Structures are given as C-alpha cells and as structure tokens.
Regions:
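Active-site-proximal specificity loops/subdomain of glycosyltransferases
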Residues: 49-98
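N-proximal low-complexity "stem/linker" segments adjacent to membrane-targeting elements
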Residues: 1-27
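Conserved catalytic core of nucleotide-sugar-dependent glycosyltransferases
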Residues: 108-212
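Conserved glycosyltransferase catalytic-site signature
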Residues: 80-85, 187-191, 217-225
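Short beta-strand/loop segment that forms part of the nucleotide-sugar
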Residues: 36-46, 65-69
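Short beta-strand-to-loop acidic/aromatic patch adjacent to the donor-nucleotide binding site
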Residues: 97-108
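Short, acidic, metal-binding catalytic loop of nucleotide-sugar glycosyltransferases
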Residues: 24-36
Length: 295
C-alpha cells in the first residue's frame, strides 16, 4: 500500500555534502512544509549520509542509490537525470502524493506555503505538469531570453556523433516538439514541483530514464523539461511576483531578510550572498525563523 501524503519532498544528496548543512536543509523542510508532507532523502553520496541523517531525524525516509565505498564519481548532466528518473519512478510507486518537490542540499525552506500553493495551481490546471523558475525569475529577469543558448546545446546532443544518444534525443524531441516544446525551454531544478499526473505519465513513458541519456551533456533540468512536453504536459512559472520560489542558479541575489519578507518559501543557492559564505547565510535564515513574526 503506497504511503499517503500531500506533498513528497525529495532531496538528492551527492558526494562531498557537508552533513551539518544537509541537516539544516532537512530541518528547514520539516519546519515549513505542509503538515502532511513526507521527506525523502535520496542518498547518492557513497558516504552513508542517508543513514546518518535517518539516525538524527528518524521521521525521514531514505532511498540509497550508492552504498558507502562505491565509486563516488558524480555529474549533474545526463547521469544525474537517469538517477532522478529512477527516484521519480520509485516515489510514484511507493507514495500516494499530490505533488513531488525537489530541494537541493544548498536550498532551504524559509516560509510555509510552497507545496500547498503548487497543489492548488496544478489542481486548477491539469496541464501544468511542472512548476518552478521557468520563464521569469523571482527578480523579474527574463529567463526565456536564455533559452536559445540552451537550445543550441539541445541541438548538439540531438546531432551527437554518438548514435545511441542522438537516436533517443531525436525520438524524444519529435514528440516534445509536436506538443509545443521550444528548444531550450526549461524549469530550474531546485524548488521544481511535478504533479502526480506528470510523475505517472513520465513513469509510463518508455524513454524516461533510459541509460542512453547518461551520455547527454544536458543538465537534468533541461532533459526533464523536454520530457514534460513529450508526455503532453506543460511547465509553468512559480517564482515571479508573489509566487513562492526565490531561486537563482548560483548565489542569492536578495538578502535572507528580503526573501523572507517577500514571502518566498524556497530559496537557492544558499552557498553565498554578497560577502557572506554558506555558514553565514544559513545562520541568518535560522535567526529569521526564530523571530515570531517570521514563523
């Protein structure tokens, strides 16, 4: 019997993750996520970080992709996509959720409401298979202006001299383009949320997670955005205006206090802000979380 929950929030954990930072991220989720959520740590660290986190936080679930002592090689391109696809399939069969949210180890929750808002939006429009920082970033930057550059990378993979990769890319893109895919369109991975319907459609799609994609030089979020189109669904914005994500690819561009004040619920990347390093950024978010008006 699948485990029932409102939202399932999964955290992929790779090698060289600082354990204290991992716990800080997990605890922020437990504080701010919807009360009926479940938290799944996906341990790809080859260092046993999942077992250590489970010991510290018995309420979390752990999926181990690499046991301690395994080869710790890691990339964020096609190889990561194949592992995330495995995670999505596992989650879809193991849990009965309405929304599947991804948070990276350099992300935090700092206000409540992100998962609840996603469930409401996707429930009101079944075509919205994935939400995230899509065409417009939280600060108003036009991300769509960057799509053509990513589109060129997609085309290079489509025309790869590796015929196995080129073949699956052509098959995937043929269906995605028939459903309105724009070359290079993509939702930023951290903070992205897929609907239950999207996860079921992806899990049933024959090419989803195919090992041949491990050779791709596309990021995991580039590939997932193509797959969302291929299964007949769409992506939508979840960061601009009063929407809950405050995410950038690299360091934060707004201070922790401004992000909390603006009502952003998920922030990325907390590795830095201005002159602050990750320790200082995380400490400031913890301070803000302890202030009653931010609770």
């Amino acid at each position: 019997m699948p485990v029932a929950c409102s939202s399932l929030i999964y955290v992929p954990v790779g090698p060289a993750t600082r354990f204290e930072f991992l716990l800080d991220t997990l605890r922020s989720i437990e504080r701010f996520a919807e009360s009926r959520h479940r938290l799944l740590l996906v341990d790809d660290s080859a260092e046993g970080l999942g077992a250590r986190a489970k010991e510290a936080m018995p309420e979390i679930d752990v999926l181990v992709l690499r046991e301690p002592g395994s080869d710790a090689a890691y990339n964020v391109d096609g190889g990561l996509f194949v592992k995330v696809a495995r995670t999505v399939r596992y989650a879809t069969t193991t849990y009965s959720f309405q929304a599947l949210m991804r948070l990276d180890t350099d992300a935090l929750m700092c206000n409540s409401g992100a998962d609840t808002r996603a469930i409401e939006l996707q429930g009101s429009d079944p075509r919205l298979g994935m939400l995230g920082s899509f065409r417009t970033r939280c600060d108003g930057h036009n991300r769509a202006a960057d799509f053509p550059k990513i589109g060129n990378l997609v085309r290079r993979n489509e025309g790869s001299p590796d015929e196995e990769l080129a073949s699956v890319m052509r098959s995937l893109l043929s269906e995605a383009c028939a459903n309105g895919y724009e070359y290079g369109e993509h939702v930023l991975g951290p903070g992205s949320i897929m609907s239950r319907a999207a996860c079921e459609a992806l899990s049933a799609y024959p090419l989803y997670g195919d090992e041949r994609f491990s050779k791709a030089s596309l990021s995991e979020d580039h590939l997932h955005s193509i797959f969302i189109r291929a299964v007949g669904l769409e992506s939508g914005d979840f960061a601009c205006d009063d929407l809950p994500l405050g995410v950038w690819s690299w360091h934060l561009q707004w201070s922790p206090e401004e992000l909390v004040w603006r009502g952003k619920s998920v922030v990325h990347s907390v590795r830095g802000y201005g002159d602050w390093g990750e320790d200082e950024v995380r400490a400031e978010f913890r301070r803000l979380a302890a202030v009653p008006r931010y609770s």
